[in-house]
């Protein structure tokens, strides 16, 4: 790997941090807006459920997000503030379907200590001011003028230093806040203040409330006419206003999120730390509050946000489990729950650990993550590409084409599968035992190759061979009519739909036939100047049986042409350029947009948007799918149309948000595909590969596939052991007792079924910190080693831990030996046939010794002190890289002769590390708790020992995510014949559920892409006017520095989503053809 790195997202963040509901895209439309770490999603509530309208990245981590409606506006605006003290106000532009920035700014202060409890951003209900609490002791006010424009911000001193929550109150003549705070004796109180815009200070508010519940943590302002505020504690809920005080006791719980149900604010949904959802009701007579009632409704994921949509439908956003769309029913179900889950939205976060494995042994990595937390904990298997789940297969050599046919046009299922070979055609059908067996269609020719087949109107079938077109009854299977090719001419290529046939004979003759009831009529015959290479008349208009247009690919001038049917008038001719002929053309429609796809003989695919009224082609794009000729076929899955591109690297072409996407199919070399929806194998595909015909169902059409293994507890560490085909995890379970105690386990799982095979309970207060599969010198067994710590309530740092060594015997964990340690075993590594452990501040090497009685034990060989806490350790050969709690990366070396570990070099910057990895002998990768990644290099050329002992920082970049783990590996099949296959990659997993890839590029490719990134920065403007350069700059509490040694793959790959005009603008600036740019960026997308 190198110092020239490319960082890109393989899976976008999935943790929901904020959500809100309002009329954002139009005054009549109800929208749900969801924040996921660094992304904003806008959904529309439709009768079919939630419909995604937009999903955009934000150049910042979202700290607060609120909808509000300024005076005189018909729809809501969105206020967003980021953790790096930038804010923006966004508005939806209905005409262009884009976000526009109404206001933006920087609200950072030179002085001031950032708040411990996170940022607070609130908007006065009467839209007079925005309030921000970003630093201890300060409240920042941004006033609105009477036109809804923002005026200059100012700070007001806030006496309360330990602020827990601040909210604006309803129904106040001047903007008024309620502040929930903790004093220096740990008691909690609420105070109210009026904001005086004239004097720019606080005026004592209408009321205050002292000595609340010790767990009071959340304020909910109640709208007019009731007004006042709800104070949510762990054991009580209080309603408070200038003239009322009501309190009710509750079952001990920590409320994590709330959502208002009614506009008048008399009912609220509360979600707690255990995933229970309650309804809180304020009882009142007119405007007088008479009391509070609370009722348990049921269980959801542990909520981070709750948004009530409409008609008892609620969105529950979660950071610890899958987010959910739920319905609240009036009557409870059999289990007494009022909650019905309508939809789940996958969340991988927080990814605490993961491993990369090749379970299917296909040469393709899959990531198995420890995801979620507490009761929502799970394992997730993430893989790239689309899988085919095989249902049946037969050995067949030399397949040249395949088509499925029905026994009558109204049948729901296909009956026949026609398989064509060089000198014969075979017909397969399902027998009573649901097996494929050979049958006959008497009217078909079976001793010649079939060029095309299709179901036809009037319960007929059509077969095209090199010398005839045959029309056959699908019920009697007898020939009803035929058309013969003129003497001396043979049919080279043909296509058909239910009522039309188009074919080309040698010499450039194009013949168009129409199908009637027992009739085949030659309607038109034209002579073209060159030979025809491919044809298509797939209907994309209103009539599913008839096409108005024909697409024709040509030899010699290498063009694709569009003709109008029935009279074969040429309306469009598009020269493709280059020397490779089109091998397959297809007219298709995705999400209401018509396209022409054109596949070339070298594995490239061109796509155009097609104007069906005039045949014009526009927005030409070229991608490389494989290296051999591609055949295109449509199929449908989950009632959407997709296209299968069969070649040496098969892919599925589909559309999402009106954008064409390409996803690899996890099969090697597919020559032909056709849909085969039979009664025994519904929604299946028939796939011809080298020497076999497979029938199987296809996965959901998306780029990454995520399988969930719910375990109902929190997995913290995971490890795979190939020899025993198992995984071992260390996990904790929260016991639902009054004391909220935890139990920790090591569990063994089957690598295929993910069933629990065996469990080993850890001691009281003992938790698993690290896990490893390894073998030792002079011992052929493979072991699982587990490092633990005893976390005692009275200790700041653990003073005791264990290393447990297990062997898997008959699917069970057997403890072979254990070794007590003087601290937490944060990390374990296999090291030259020995075991390397990091224990608190020490690195310790153990060898595997045979005792006299034949048992084995770990014996200490040597160690190295000099760390604050050695949390993360990676090894390569004799080198040991250590990521310290706060002293960045140091490099140690093991000296065999002396049997000692010495420090070789270190990075002298103060970085609080969260993960470390070795890229090669000289380059080391690290990440810190300020969401940066960086690379340091061993200084081999240094003239003095002092210079050589100092590592040089060669790369710095703000990834904007909290990274928990790096692992070498890839999510895609490494294909030996592609340049991309040679690029080394590291995968990382984050708290927000984002999975990223860091790829090391050759320097000349890096330089080219850096130029492209600079051009893209000018053309693609950040949402809310936020700067890309500032966002990606390295940033911690001490310093900010421009990014170096890293490129933003997400920005570079967004080039492919640009309009043709913008692509050309960039192409001019770089002096590189658009096609070449597309090809180079396309290739990068194959890294993930």
Swiss-Prot record:
What's a Pfam family this protein contains?
A: Beta-prop_RSE1_2nd
Question: Could you tell me which pathway this protein works in?
Answer: Protein modification; protein ubiquitination
Top-level taxon of the source organism: Eukaryota
> What SUPFAM superfamilies would the database entry show?
WD40 repeat-like (SSF50978)
The yes or no answer to whether the keyword Ribonucleoprotein is present is no
Q: Which GO terms describe its cellular component?
A: cytosol; nucleus
Indicate where this protein resides in the cell.
Nucleus
Tell me yes or no: is DNA repair among this UniProt entry's keywords. yes
Q: Which Gene3D superfamilies match?
A: 1.10.150.910, YVTN repeat-like/Quinoprotein amine dehydrogenase
Q: Which UniProt keywords apply?
A: DNA damage, DNA repair, DNA-binding, Nucleus, Phytochrome signaling pathway
Q: One biological-process term from Gene Ontology?
A: embryo development ending in seed dormancy
Q: Which GO terms describe its molecular function?
A: DNA binding
> Subunit structure, per the record?
Interacts with DDA1. Binds to KTN80.2/DWA3. Interacts with HTD1.
* Job of this protein: Component of light signal transduction machinery. Involved in repression of photomorphogenesis in darkness. Plays a role in DNA repair by forming with DDB2 the UV-damaged DNA-binding protein complex (UV-DDB).
Return the similarity comment.
Answer: Belongs to the DDB1 family.
- Protein's name according to its UniProt entry: DNA damage-binding protein 1b
Species source reads Arabidopsis thaliana (Mouse-ear cress)
The gene is DDB1B
């Amino acid at each position: 790997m190198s110092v020239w790195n490319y960082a890109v997202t393989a899976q976008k963040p999935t943790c929901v941090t904020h959500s809100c509901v309002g009329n954002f895209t139009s005054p009549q439309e109800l929208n749900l807006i969801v924040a996921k770490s660094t992304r904003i999603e806008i959904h529309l509530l439709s009768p079919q459920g939630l419909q995604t309208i937009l999903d955009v990245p934000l150049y910042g981590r979202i700290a607060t997000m609120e909808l509000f409606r300024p005076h005189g506006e018909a729809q809501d605006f969105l206020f967003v503030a980021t953790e790096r003290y930038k804010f923006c106000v966004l508005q939806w532009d209905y005409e262009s379907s884009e976000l526009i920035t109404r206001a933006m700014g920087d609200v950072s202060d030179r002085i001031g200590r950032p708040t411990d409890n996170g940022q607070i951003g609130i908007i006065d209900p009467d839209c007079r001011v925005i309030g921000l609490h970003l630093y201890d002791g300060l409240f920042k006010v941004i006033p609105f003028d009477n036109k809804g424009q923002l005026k200059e911000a100012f700070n007001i001193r806030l006496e309360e230093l330990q602020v827990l929550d601040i909210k604006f109150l309803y129904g106040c003549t001047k903007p008024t806040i309620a502040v929930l705070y903790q004093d220096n004796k740990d008691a909690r109180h609420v105070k109210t203040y009026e904001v005086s815009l004239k004097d720019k200070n606080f005026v004592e508010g209408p009321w205050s409330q002292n000595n609340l519940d010790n767990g009071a943590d959340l304020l909910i302002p109640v709208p007019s006419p009731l007004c006042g505020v709800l104070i949510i504690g762990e054991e009580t809920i209080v309603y408070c206003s200038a003239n009322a005080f009501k309190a009710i006791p509750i079952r001990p719980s920590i409320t994590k999120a709330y959502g208002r149900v009614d506009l008048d604010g008399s009912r609220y949904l509360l979600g707690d730390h255990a995933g229970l959802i309650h309804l809180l009701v304020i009882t009142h007579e007119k405007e007088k509050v008479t009391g509070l009632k609370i009722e348990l409704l049921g269980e959801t994921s542990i909520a981070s946000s709750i948004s009530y949509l409409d008609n008892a439908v609620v969105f529950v956003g979660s950071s610890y489990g899958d987010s959910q769309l739920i319905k609240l029913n009036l009557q409870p179900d059999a289990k007494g729950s009022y909650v019905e889950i309508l939809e789940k939205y996958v969340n991988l976060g927080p990814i605490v650990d993961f491993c990369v494995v090749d379970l299917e042994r296909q040469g393709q990595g899959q990531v198995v993550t420890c995801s979620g937390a507490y009761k929502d904990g799970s394992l997730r298997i993430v893989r790239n590409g689309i899988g085919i789940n095989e249902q049946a297969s037969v050995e067949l050599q030399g397949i040249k084409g395949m088509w499925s046919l029905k026994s009558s046009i109204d049948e729901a299922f296909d009956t026949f599968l026609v398989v064509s070979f060089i000198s014969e055609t075979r017909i397969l059908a399902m027998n009573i035992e649901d097996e494929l067996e050979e049958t006959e269609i008497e009217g078909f020719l079976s001793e010649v190759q079939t060029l095309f087949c299709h179901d036809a109107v009037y319960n007929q079938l059509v077969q095209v061979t090199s010398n005839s077109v045959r029309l056959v009854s699908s019920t009697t299977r007898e020939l009803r009519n035929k058309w013969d090719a003129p003497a001396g001419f043979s049919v080279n290529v043909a296509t058909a739909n239910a009522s039309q046939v188009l074919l080309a004979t040698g010499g450039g003759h194009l013949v168009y036939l129409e199908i009637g009831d027992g009739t085949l009529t030659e309607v038109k015959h034209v002579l073209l100047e060159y030979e025809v290479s491919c044809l298509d008349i797939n209907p994309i208009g209103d009539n599913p049986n008839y096409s108005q247009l024909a697409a024709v690919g040509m030899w010699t001038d290498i063009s694709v042409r569009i003709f109008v049917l029935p009279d074969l008038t040429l309306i469009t001719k598009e020269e493709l350029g280059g020397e490779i002929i089109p091998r397959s053309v297809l007219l298709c429609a995705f999400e209401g947009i018509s396209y022409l796809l054109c596949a070339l003989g070298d594995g490239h695919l061109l796509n155009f948007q097609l104007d069906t009224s005039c045949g014009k082609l526009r927005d030409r794009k070229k991608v490389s799918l494989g290296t051999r000729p591609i055949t295109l076929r449509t199929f449908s899955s989950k009632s959407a149309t997709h296209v299968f591109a069969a070649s040496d690297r098969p892919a599925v072409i589909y559309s999402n948000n009106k954008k064409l996407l390409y996803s690899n199919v996890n099969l090697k070399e597919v020559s032909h595909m056709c849909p085969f929806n039979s009664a025994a194998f519904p929604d299946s595909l028939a796939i011809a590969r080298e020497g076999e015909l497979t029938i199987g169902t296809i996965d959901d059409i998306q780029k990454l596939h995520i399988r969930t293994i719910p375990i109902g507890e929190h997995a913290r560490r995971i490890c795979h052991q190939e020899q025993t085909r198992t995984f071992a995890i260390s996990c904790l379970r929260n016991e639902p007792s009054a004391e909220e105690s935890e139990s920790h386990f090591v569990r063994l799982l089957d690598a295929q079924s993910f069933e629990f095979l065996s469990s080993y309970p850890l001691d009281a207060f003992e938790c698993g910190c690290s896990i490893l599969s390894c073998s030792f010198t002079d011992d052929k067994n493979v072991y699982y080693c587990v490092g633990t710590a005893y976390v005692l309530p009275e200790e700041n740092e653990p003073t005791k831990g264990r290393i447990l060594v297990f062997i898997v015997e008959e699917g069970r964990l057997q403890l072979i030996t254990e070794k007590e340690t003087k601290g937490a075993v944060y990390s374990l590594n296999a090291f030259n046939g020995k075991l390397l452990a990091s224990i608190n501040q020490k690195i310790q090497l153990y060898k595997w010794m045979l005792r006299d009685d034949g048992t084995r034990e770990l014996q200490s060989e040597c160690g190295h002190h000099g760390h604050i806490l050695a949390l993360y350790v990676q090894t390569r050969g004799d080198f040991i890289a250590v990521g310290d709690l706060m002293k960045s990366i140091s490099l140690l070396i093991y000296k065999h002769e002396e049997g000692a570990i010495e420090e070789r070099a270190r990075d002298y910057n103060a970085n609080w590390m969260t993960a470390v990895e070795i890229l090669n002998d000289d380059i080391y990768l690290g990440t810190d708790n300020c969401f940066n990644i960086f690379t340091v290099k061993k200084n081999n050329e240094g003239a003095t020992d002092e210079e050589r002992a100092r590592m040089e920082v060669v790369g710095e970049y703000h990834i904007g995510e909290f990274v928990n783990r790096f692992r070498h590996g890839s999510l895609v099949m490494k294909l030996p014949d592609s340049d991309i296959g040679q690029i080394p990659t590291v995968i990382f997993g984050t708290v927000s559920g984002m999975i990223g890839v860091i790829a090391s590029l050759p320097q000349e490719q890096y330089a080219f892409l850096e130029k492209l990134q600079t051009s893209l920065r000018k053309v693609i403007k950040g949402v809310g006017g936020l700067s890309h350069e500032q966002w990606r700059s390295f940033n911690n509490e001490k310093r900010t520095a421009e990014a170096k040694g890293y490129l933003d793959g997400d920005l570079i790959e967004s080039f492919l989503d640009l309009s043709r005009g913008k692509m050309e603008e960039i192409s001019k600036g770089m002096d590189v053809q658009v096609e070449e740019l597309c090809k180079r960026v396309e290739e990068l997308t194959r890294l993930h």
